[in-house]
């Protein structure tokens, strides 16, 4: 597999950090609205549109630029590494959020790329653990769709 096991986790974490910075420092301002009474709030619909646009950008850039020469098997195995990291650190942050709150924030920065998935599941009022399982397990495998059927490396 030519040492490709790290590519999906590294790409997704780097993309997540960039998405987080864009949301907090730039794009999030678009979702801030002033209500008729003068109070300031965030518009959930705008935030979801912004998150969906970032998700699509991350998937398209990853799929068409970074993973297009990898086989589907390589991408699948690399995505499995990210799933394991999601589950291990997701459970860790859930259990230890009061003890290590800064790690919880740090981990959320590194998993921001697919936040639209958990936002949509929240809108569906799914059970908290079912939502977490879906959000942790499924999104990394979307990149498999962009892989080649056979090894093109020679």
Where are the model-predicted features located?
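Alpha-helical membrane-inserting segments
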Residues: 18-30, 58, 62-66, 88, ...
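Hydrophobic alpha-helical membrane-insertion segments
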Residues: 11-23, 77-101
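Transmembrane alpha-helical insertion/packing segments
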Residues: 1-52
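Interfacial non-cytosolic loop connecting adjacent transmembrane helices
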Residues: 29-46, 90-130
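Canonical alpha-helical transmembrane segments
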Residues: 47-74
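Membrane-interfacial entry segments at the cytosolic side of transmembrane helices
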Residues: 70-79, 126-130
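Cytosolic juxtamembrane helix at the C-terminal end of the final transmembrane segment
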Residues: 67, 134-154
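Hydrophobic alpha-helical transmembrane segments
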Residues: 49-56, 117-141
């Amino acid at each position: 597999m030519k040492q490709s096991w790290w590519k999906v986790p590294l790409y997704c974490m780097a993309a997540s950090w960039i998405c987080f910075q864009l949301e907090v420092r730039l794009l999030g301002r678009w979702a801030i609205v002033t209500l008729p009474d003068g109070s300031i709030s965030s518009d959930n619909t705008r935030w979801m549109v912004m998150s969906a646009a970032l998700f699509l950008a991350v998937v398209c850039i990853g799929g068409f630029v970074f993973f297009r020469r990898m086989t589907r098997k390589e991408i699948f195995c690399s995505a499995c590494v990210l799933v394991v990291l999601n589950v291990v650190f997701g459970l860790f942050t859930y259990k230890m959020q009061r003890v290590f709150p800064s790690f919880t924030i740090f981990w959320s920065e590194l998993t921001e790329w697919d936040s639209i998935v958990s936002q949509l599941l929240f809108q569906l009022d799914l059970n908290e653990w079912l939502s977490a399982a879906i959000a942790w397990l499924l999104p990394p495998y979307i990149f498999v769709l962009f892989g080649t059927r056979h090894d093109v490396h020679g």
